[in-house]
């Protein structure tokens, strides 16, 4: 059976609720005007911190704000950093630093300093004994300018100390590593195709990436740095450290005639003659010699 629903207009509903809303608003206004606070406010005041609690008020006027930027007038980020300074009249540069100043002190040792002196790598001051207190790092750079870009072709010369993989003694290794950096005034954006040239591009007569880079396609994307025209210098110490890290090998030897360690007692055969261990005649396939018979 169908029962019709009564229809009430919005105006009628508001008229019915208006007396109730008026009573609640008057009660709230009276509570606010009364001198006696509500019970919940009194409870909140009782739980407040006591007056004898130790507090410190910070005076913001006595705090010096931190500088937003580093002073551009500094000669270099740190002492011994390799920093290229823009100069249109200079085409060749020489830098002298040390492994310690470049953050590679773990690769420096008295053996590396002695080998560097033998190779004629000298840089910095000498100590009281006439020896170098740090391992020198010499960097030579040739500058080529081309269409708002600077190409730095250089060589890093130093000596690092590695562990001999035969006897585990210090093994100084001379480093002569070439590097190339490309400094561009425009932001460096890596191509999405990573230099891939498709056959249809050649058929359409499009310019290849090699022609677009004008002979700089041999420089890796990680070696291309943004050097705005307004900047006067750029720090390339990170790339020098990376070049030295790439020269670390696992097959370094202290001497081509190194005898290594005894496989039985572990004695260094280069410095001891008391090892009496006899070499064992190991026949690798002797247990399997009769398998195919």
Curated annotation (Swiss-Prot):
GO cellular component, one term: chloroplast
Residues annotated as signal peptide: none
Tissue-wise expression: Highly expressed in shoots and leaves. Detected in roots, embryos and endosperm.
Listed GO biological process terms: ribosome biogenesis
Chief location category: plastid
Subcellular location(s) per record: Plastid, Chloroplast
Segment annotated as transit peptide: 1-42
Inactivation phenotype: Embryonic lethality when homozygous in non-permissive genetic background (cv. Wisconsin 22) or albino seedlings in permissive background (cv. B73).
Keyword Repeat belongs to the record: no
Keyword terms: Chloroplast, Plastid, Ribosome biogenesis, Transit peptide
Protein's UniProt keywords contain Lipid biosynthesis: no
Pfam family, one: YceD
Function: Plays a role in synthesis, processing and/or stability of 23S rRNA. Required for embryogenesis. May be involved in RPL23 transcript levels regulation in non-photosynthetic plastids.
PANTHER family to which the protein is assigned, alphabetical: LARGE RIBOSOMAL RNA SUBUNIT ACCUMULATION PROTEIN YCED HOMOLOG 1, CHLOROPLASTIC
Family: Belongs to the DUF177 domain family.
Protein name: Large ribosomal RNA subunit accumulation protein YCED homolog 1, chloroplastic
Organism: Zea mays
């Amino acid at each position: 059976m169908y029962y019709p629903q009564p229809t009430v207009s919005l105006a009628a509903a508001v008229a019915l609720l208006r007396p109730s809303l008026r009573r609640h608003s008057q009660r709230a206004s009276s509570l606010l005007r009364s001198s006696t606070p509500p019970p919940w406010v009194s409870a909140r005041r009782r739980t407040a911190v006591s007056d004898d609690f130790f507090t410190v008020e910070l005076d913001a006027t006595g705090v010096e704000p931190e500088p937003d930027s580093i002073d551009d007038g500094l000669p270099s980020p740190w002492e011994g950093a390799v920093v290229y300074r823009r100069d249109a009249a200079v085409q060749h540069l020489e830098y002298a630093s040390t492994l310690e100043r470049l953050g590679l002190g773990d690769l420096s040792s008295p053996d590396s300093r002695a080998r560097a002196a033998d190779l004629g790598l000298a840089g910095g001051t000498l100590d009281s004994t006439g020896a170098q207190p740090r391992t020198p790092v010499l960097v030579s750079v040739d500058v080529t300018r081309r269409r708002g870009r600077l190409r730095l072709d250089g060589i890093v010369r130093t000596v690092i100390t590695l562990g001999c993989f035969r006897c585990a003694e210090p093994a100084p290794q001379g480093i002569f590593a070439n590097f190339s950096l490309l400094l561009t005034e425009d932001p460096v954006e890596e191509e999405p195709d990573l230099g891939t040239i498709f056959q249809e591009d050649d058929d359409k007569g499009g310019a290849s990436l090699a022609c677009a880079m004008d002979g700089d396609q041999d420089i890796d994307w990680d070696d291309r740095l943004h050097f705005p025209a307004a900047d006067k210098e750029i720090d390339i110490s990170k790339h020098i450290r990376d070049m030295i890290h790439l020269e670390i090998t696992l097959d370094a030897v202290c001497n081509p005639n190194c005898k290594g360690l005894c496989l039985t007692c572990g004695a260094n055969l280069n410095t001891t003659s008391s090892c009496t261990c006899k070499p064992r005649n190991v026949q690798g396939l002797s247990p399997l010699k009769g398998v195919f018979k």
